[in-house]
């Protein structure tokens, strides 16, 4: 069954688009409710202004930037998503008639997950990028990436594939074509807008804008802000995020960036994309990350569709089951792997403590089910959270749902209470807390904040929890230590899913120094990324410590 047959709309073909020209709503103007406008003439004027009917596809080239959503060192005002190396020789081909998009760029290898393009989707514990040239492709419900020119295609998970397909249409021509598709149901309104504080100066004269919203794939509500020149300057929607819920997603384009390509076609050269609200001083959130992608792409080839994007058989056949492997690494201590991110369950006399709730709710529900099978009839009383990167906290709400108390560093507390563990809307991918919210988050025993150290104990078994610093990677990092078992449990400080490094990293040395300062007796290190290994393997990486 195809993407379109599954209820995501009709195939995006030129024939379909021609069948549905913009038409004014056959109602008298006064029959629209107050505040609403007829979207037909607005969309038709915008399409005429930029020559949408004359553009079937486009290839753009330039230099871009990539923001790693959820990988900031800390959550605070004016702290954006971290940016890595530029996306050099960036090329994007968008073929709206076929519903396909190709992106390619050069980026230094060895620093980023191979599966990560930009914005959402950064996952530690996954294979690193090995080659400079990267390609990302989407055709309908299928998406994949290629790490280097001769590499095998690797299928993208459904959440990434859906976002890449949506992104094909979040641009001026894409939006106007999508507005003609069956089920789009355009609606329009208007408002006055002033310039942005701090960017556009002390603007006092507002501009009247029209906003047209459409429905895409029966799921996403997408709106475009159109100015008096009939140019689309902002295209906005929401996308699902395991941590933040319904997440702001938008592209912005200035009037000056539109260039004339001939045949009545105009296309923007400057792209500015937000994943997260572009508002450093909003009151409802702590996190201020927003710049996920952008750049100048001023080499534009209209109606250059390039080769067809054919879905590889391996991608078409790919599945993404949630698999949990379990191993008892010490009496009552269970490693729960089978994914890019692990969890560890520790049995106490009358409760269970779990270290780490990564990725998303689906993963953590499977882990919780495995724990219940391993240790029946005891409550999961505590969830120890190592740090606040998105790929490590996607299951916090799942543990809140089952009644666990979350132990985290005090630097993470305000971000969690304001942005993550809340009653915020989650309409695109409802989770357990949004479907069955607890009576009162404010009165529940949901948090323990750690400053320097914390101990969980039943009188026989102890779990010591320590603040790890300094770190350039993140602030608010915790590690767990089981003294009786001589086990250290840590995240991102020493990973074993890849070949061990030839020389120690700064994070490796911070972990080593922490263990030395605290005089911990360690036999086994249990990373969140990778399998447990003897402490001696870690010391081999650290090397000569006689001078330390």
Task: Spell out what each predicted region is.
Residues 31-41, 119-221, 239-247, 311-315, ...:
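Flexible, processing/modification-adjacent segments and terminal tails
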Residues 203-309, 478-483, 490-491, 496-516:
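Gly/Pro-enriched, hydrophobic low-complexity segments
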Residues 45-48, 52-150, 186-197:
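N-terminal mature ectodomain segment of secretory-pathway/periplasmic proteins
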Residues 327-371, 477-495:
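Conserved beta-strand hairpin/beta-sheet module of binuclear metal-dependent hydrolase folds
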Residues 512-548:
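Divalent-metal (often Zn2+) His-rich catalytic cores of metallo-beta-lactamase-fold enzymes
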Residues 362-407, 517-521:
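Active-site metal-binding motif and surrounding structural segment of the metallo-beta-lactamase
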Residues 13-26:
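Bacterial N-terminal signal peptides
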Residues 282-349:
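Zn-dependent metallo-beta-lactamase
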């Amino acid at each position: 069954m195809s993407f379109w047959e599954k209820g995501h709309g009709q195939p995006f073909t030129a024939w379909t688009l021609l069948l549905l020209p913009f038409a004014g709503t056959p109602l008298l103007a006064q029959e629209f409710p107050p505040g609403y406008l007829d979207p037909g003439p607005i969309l038709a004027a915008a399409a005429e202004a930029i020559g949408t009917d004359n553009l079937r596809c486009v290839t753009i080239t330039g230099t871009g930037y990539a923001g790693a959503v959820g990988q900031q060192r800390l959550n605070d005002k004016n702290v954006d998503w971290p940016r890595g190396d530029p996306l050099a020789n960036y090329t994007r081909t968008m073929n709206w008639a076929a519903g396909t998009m190709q992106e390619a760029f050069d980026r230094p290898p060895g620093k980023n997950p191979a599966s990560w393009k930009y914005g959402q989707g950064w996952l530690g514990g996954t294979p690193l990028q090995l080659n400079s040239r990267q390609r990302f492709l989407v055709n309908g419900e299928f998406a994949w990436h290629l790490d280097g020119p001769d590499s095998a295609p690797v299928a993208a998970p459904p959440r990434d594939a859906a976002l890449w397909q949506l992104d094909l249409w979040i641009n001026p021509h894409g939006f106007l074509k999508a507005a003609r598709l069956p089920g789009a149901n355009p609606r329009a309104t208007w408002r006055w807008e002033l310039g942005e504080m701090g960017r556009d100066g002390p603007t006092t004269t507002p501009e009247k804008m029209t906003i047209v919203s459409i429905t895409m794939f029966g799921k996403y509500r997408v709106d475009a802000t159109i100015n008096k020149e009939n140019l689309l300057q902002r295209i906005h929607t929401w996308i699902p995020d395991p941590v933040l819920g319904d997440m702001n997603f938008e592209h912005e384009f200035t009037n000056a960036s539109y260039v004339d390509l001939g045949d009545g076609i105009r296309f923007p050269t400057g792209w500015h994309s937000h994943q997260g609200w572009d508002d450093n001083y909003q009151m409802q959130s702590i996190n201020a990350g927003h710049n996920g992608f952008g750049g100048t792409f001023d080499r534009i080839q209209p109606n250059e569709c390039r080769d067809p994007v054919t879905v590889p058989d391996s991608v078409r056949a790919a599945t993404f089951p949630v698999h949990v492997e379990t191993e008892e690494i010490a009496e009552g201590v269970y490693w729960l792997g089978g994914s890019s991110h692990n969890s560890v369950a520790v049995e106490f006399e009358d409760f269970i403590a779990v270290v780490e709730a990564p990725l998303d709710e689906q993963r953590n529900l499977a882990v919780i089910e495995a724990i219940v099978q391993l240790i029946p009839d005891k409550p999961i009383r505590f969830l120890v959270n190592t740090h606040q990167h998105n790929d490590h906290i996607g299951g916090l709400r799942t543990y809140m749902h089952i009644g666990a108390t979350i132990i985290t560093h005090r630097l993470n507390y305000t971000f969690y209470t304001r942005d993550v563990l809340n009653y915020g809307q989650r309409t695109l991918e409802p989770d357990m807390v949004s479907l069955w919210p607890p009576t009162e988050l404010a009165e529940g025993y949901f948090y323990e904040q750690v400053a320097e150290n914390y101990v969980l104990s039943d009188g026989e078994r102890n779990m010591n929890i320590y603040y790890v610093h300094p770190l350039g990677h993140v602030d608010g990092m915790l590690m767990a230590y089981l003294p009786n078992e001589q086990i250290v449990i840590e995240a991102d400080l020493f990973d074993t899913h890849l070949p061990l490094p030839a020389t120690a990293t700064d994070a490796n040395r911070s972990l080593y120094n922490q263990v030395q300062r605290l005089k911990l007796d360690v036999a086994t290190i249990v990373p969140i990324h990778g399998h447990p290994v003897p402490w001696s393997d870690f010391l081999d990486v650290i090397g000569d410590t006689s001078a330390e």
